[in-house]
């Protein structure tokens, strides 16, 4: 009866797990959206392996791995767009290493990368 009352009240009801915990507390980061669209282009297992390669990391939650993967995607997208703009200035469509160097020098947010490609 309580399930019917909760369903009819218009408020979402948390499912009880066998241990008595709510299912929402056991939720993991989604890897795909409804309809089969992947939310992360990077393989989460590979990202997790990279994170765990750091000796300072003992535990890495699935949500943290997903957020790191998404942040890496956005970073690569941003630097690639800036490097592509440098390639277009040279009337080229193909990115070259010098385009990345120019993007790193031109954008303040990439200052931490200066000298890393040497």
Swiss-Prot record:
Task: Give residues where Phosphothreonine occurs.
Answer: 11
Cysteine-cysteine disulfides: none
Residues bearing N-acetylalanine are 2
Instruction: List the SUPFAM superfamilies.
Output: Histone-fold
Segments of skewed composition (Low complexity): 1-11, 19-35
> Where is this gene product found?
Nucleus
Write out the entry's keywords from A to Z.
Acetylation, DNA-binding, Nucleus, Phosphoprotein
Of the GO CC terms on this record, one is: epsilon DNA polymerase complex
Annotated InterPro entries: CBFA_NFYB_domain (IPR003958), Histone-fold (IPR009072), Transcr_DNA_Rep_Reg (IPR050568)
From the Swiss-Prot or TrEMBL record, give the protein name.
Answer: DNA polymerase epsilon subunit 4
